[in-house]
Swiss-Prot record:
The lineage of its organism: Eukaryota, Viridiplantae, Streptophyta, Embryophyta, Tracheophyta. Keywords: Chloroplast, Membrane, NAD, NADP, Plastid, Plastoquinone, Quinone, Thylakoid, Translocase, Transmembrane, Transmembrane helix, Transport. It comes from Lobularia maritima (Sweet alyssum). NDH is composed of at least 16 different subunits, 5 of which are encoded in the nucleus. It catalyses: a plastoquinone + NADH + (n+1) H(+)(in) = a plastoquinol + NAD(+) + n H(+)(out); a plastoquinone + NADPH + (n+1) H(+)(in) = a plastoquinol + NADP(+) + n H(+)(out). The chain crosses the membrane at residues 9-29, 40-60, 89-109, 125-145, 147-167, 185-205, 221-241, 258-278, 280-300, 327-347, 354-374, 396-416, 425-445, 547-567, 608-628, 723-743. Coiled coil: none annotated. The keyword Zinc does not apply. This is NAD(P)H-quinone oxidoreductase subunit 5, chloroplastic. One of its GO terms (cellular component) is chloroplast thylakoid membrane. Gene3D superfamilies: 1.20.5.2700. Belongs to the complex I subunit 5 family. It holds the Pfam family Proton_antipo_N. One of its GO terms (molecular function) is quinone binding.
Length: 746
């Protein structure tokens, strides 16, 4: 076993040859490199698979032996300072290695098909390989300097991948926003690292924890300065894991390709912040105020992310805010001192969210053949609906991921989220109420996404008249339509517009689908000329096997990965893998608890959390399912609005929630007004001062000298004798004045 640990240093470097060789190949041999692009994909998957096998072996050793292995090499710069670098293998490292490699391999397989049409196919895989290398290096680092180095590489790779389609201004702005926002967190992290080194004189984790705890116990250091350094360390994870208030970059990061959205939200960038807080928890845990700040930031993020996801129309942005909320749960658990629950939820959420993002990518891939390659159309849930019969495998996978995130047993996220909710009651009743309420909101917005996407009828070809010109629930616009005056608005529901032609709408569509009987029995309206080119309506088709295969594997993970943390412990005997892996574990909430589980208490708590989730699902079904039912007359529904003043208050509440979510809680607007515009004004004033004042003084001196020289040249007439006469005259005048003032003193 010791022999295996000695070669652990190679883990981050195994995937590195692919991006290096791709970069060299594209520069020197572009044609040959592009012709062999499938070979590079296979090599990327193969090398990451080697890392996965190595990581599995290390994890098995950690389960049975629960040991920590560290190997450090020293690089002496001078007699007073030496830099040490190495690798650090413990249970946290082994879990992160498995998470990164398993999700990374599946995303690479998925990307082979998803990005096959893109001209930047090889560039994408080069970035992905470098991204995986950076994250593997981060989790195996043995000191804070290495952590910061790989931390910055992770940020750089995310910048490159978010702005992968850099010719699109929205994507270019999104990657800049992510980069600048994370610079704020990274600067705080750097200050915290330097402050910690100034106190302890070490960057190594084990030395750092020991020295830090000794200084706190012996009260030999300023506690306020310690707290400041610890908070600055926490600022980095706030930005990287999209915690309030540095979360604003996360929804814009959806401008990147969908596979990288899955990787960022599941196993790499946002997981890096949770990993660092978990790694530094022995430092945070001795400062109660910092632990409370961590939990407070976490609970605010939990609620904020859930409320911002309530009315999103873009399917990827809805999932992005869901990620933000779930990361808040993990941060809340770490702030409460529930180390095991936080990492358990990190694992279960990673596989569930990767499944949801890959499922959304499959949906987008199918919709692009119908509505085109504009994200405003292909990712808009308002234009979807009725996809169950068109993409049944994707629908099943997406439903499993949705149920898991809602906390429905026996799926993965149920076990971890239930543990966090139970621990929150032990920590703070107020935090517990917010966490439980947000669990209901999670179920609501996730099933809202599911219902808008898969239930009802395909809304791309539908024009819905409800008696109102605008509504956040059922206003569906038809792309390219002319004025609506051509239609009879007495219809309560116009479910289908039929035009006559046999031309194919897209080269990707191979067949049409028959209309179901329940639609066939409804009122139809035929429009011979609606201002559009006549064409036949085509429907999305299921994605290729290369896209479906990773989704099915992630579905299996979502079904069974929760088993590693199911509390089967009885009479002090630990049967679950997670307990063995984290023994001894940090848990401030169960210091005096028994080693076995009270099943009655477990089922009681589980029943409560599942009831909240089912209530959220029921509300979502009531609000969204009817609007996509072919039996509902929306004009009749709208007539109920005049019956009661409560209906008006309900509409106001809906509009408030919609505006809050659509405007991102007005936080982006606040930053734009208070920071961005202020910085722009300051930059303009600085530019004015530099150009007008600083440059004005310099240019003024130069111009003055020029004119003095010109005047002198004009008076002297360009003759040396004249210059000598003027020079002697000035000297004589100066001496006369000096002589006069000198004798006046006497």
């Amino acid at each position: 076993m010791e022999h295996t640990y000695q070669y652990s240093w190679i883990i981050p470097f195994i995937p590195l040859p692919v991006p290096i060789l791709l970069g060299v190949g594209l520069l020197l041999f572009p044609t040959a490199t592009k012709n062999l692009r499938r070979m590079w994909t296979f090599l990327s998957i193969f090398l990451l698979s080697i890392v996965m096998i190595f990581s599995l072996y290390l994890s098995i050793q950690q389960i049975f032996l629960s040991c920590i292995h560290q190997n450090v090499w020293s690089w002496t710069i001078n007699n007073e300072f030496s830099f040490e670098f190495g690798y650090f293998i413990d249970p946290l490292t082994s879990i992160m290695l498995i998470l990164i490699t398993t999700v990374g391999i599946l995303v690479l397989i998925y990307s082979d098909n998803y990005m096959s049409h893109d001209q930047g196919y090889l560039r994408f895989f080069a970035y992905m390989g470098f991204f995986n290398t950076s994250m593997l290096g981060l989790v195996t680092s043995s000191n804070l300097i290495q952590v910061y180095f790989f931390w910055e590489l992770v940020g750089m790779c995310s910048y490159l991948l978010i702005g992968f389609w850099f010719t699109r201004p929205i994507a270019a702005n999104a990657c800049q926003k992510a980069f600048v926002t994370n610079r704020v967190g990274d600067f705080g992290l750097l200050l915290g690292i330097l402050g910690l080194y100034w106190i302890t004189g070490s960057f190594e984790f084990q030395d750092l924890f020991e020295i830090f705890n000794n200084l706190i116990l012996t009260n030999r250091v300023n506690l306020l300065f310690f707290t400041l350094c610890a908070f600055l360390l926490f600022v980095g994870p706030i930005a990287k894991s999209a915690q309030f208030p540095l979360h604003v970059w996360l929804p814009d990061a959806m401008e990147g390709p969908t596979p990288i959205s899955a990787l960022i939200h599941a196993a790499t960038m946002v997981a890096a912040g949770i990993f660092l807080v978990a790694r530094l928890l022995p430092i945070f845990i001795v400062i109660p105020s910092i632990m409370y700040i961590i939990s407070l930031i976490g609970i605010i993020t939990v609620l904020l992310g859930a409320t911002l996801a309530l009315a999103q129309k873009d399917i990827k942005r809805g999932l992005a805010y869901s990620t933000m909320s779930q990361l808040g749960y993990m941060m809340l658990a770490l702030g409460m001192g529930s180390y095991r629950a936080a990492l358990f939820h990190l694992i279960t959420h990673a596989y569930s969210k990767a499944l949801l993002f890959l499922g959304s990518g499959s949906i987008i891939h199918s919709m692009e053949a119908i509505v085109g390659y504009s994200p405003d159309k292909s990712q808009n849930m308002i234009l979807m609906g009725g996809l169950t019969k068109h993409v049944p495998i994707t629908k099943t996978a997406f439903l499993v991921g949705t149920l898991s995130l809602c906390g429905i047993p026996p799926l993965a996220c149920f076990w971890s989220k239930d543990e966090i909710l139970n621990d929150s009651f032990l920590f703070s009743p107020i935090f517990a109420i917010i966490a439980c309420s947000t669990a209901g909101l999670t179920a609501f917005y996730m099933f809202r996404i599911y219902l808008l996407t898969f239930e009802g009828h395909l809304n791309t070809y539908f024009l819905n008249y409800s008696g109102k010109k605008s509504s956040s629930f059922y206003s569906i616009s038809l792309w390219g339509k002319e004025e609506e005056k051509n239609l009879n608005k007495n219809f309560g529901l116009v479910p289908l517009l039929i035009t006559n032609n046999t031309k194919r709408a897209s080269v990707f569509c191979k067949k049409t689908y028959k209309i179901s009987n329940n639609v066939r029995n409804q009122t139809f309206i035929t429009v011979e000329n609606f201002g559009l080119n006549t064409r036949t309506f085509y429907y999305p088709q299921e994605s290729d096997n290369t896209i479906l295969f990773p989704m099915l594997l992630l579905l299996l993970f979502t079904l069974f990965v929760g088993a590693i943390g199911i509390p089967f412990n009885q009479e002090g005997i630990d049967f679950d893998i997670l307990s063995k892996l984290f023994m001894p574990s940090i848990n401030l909430l169960h210091k005096n608890a028994q080693n076995f589980v009270d099943w009655y208490e477990f089922f009681r708590n589980a029943t409560f959390s599942v009831s909240i989730a089912l209530f959220g699902i029921f509300i979502a079904y009531c609000l969204y399912k009817p609007f996509y039912s072919s039996l509902l007359n929306l004009t009749v529904l709208n007539s109920f609005q005049t019956w009661s003043s409560k209906r008006i208050r309900w509409e106001k509440l809906i509009n408030f929630v919609y505006n809050w979510s659509y405007n991102r809680g007005y936080i982006d607007a606040f930053f734009k007004t208070s920071l961005t515009e202020s910085i722009i004004r300051l930059a303009k004033q600085t530019n004015f001062f530099d150009k007008r004042i600083i440059d004005g003084i310099t240019n003024g001196v130069g111009i003055t000298s020029f004119f003095v020289g010109e005047v002198t040249k004009y008076i002297g007439g360009s003759r040396i004798s004249s210059y000598l006469f003027l020079y002697l005259s000035y000297v004589l005048i100066f001496l006369t004045i000096l002589f006069f003032f000198y004798f006046e003193k006497f």
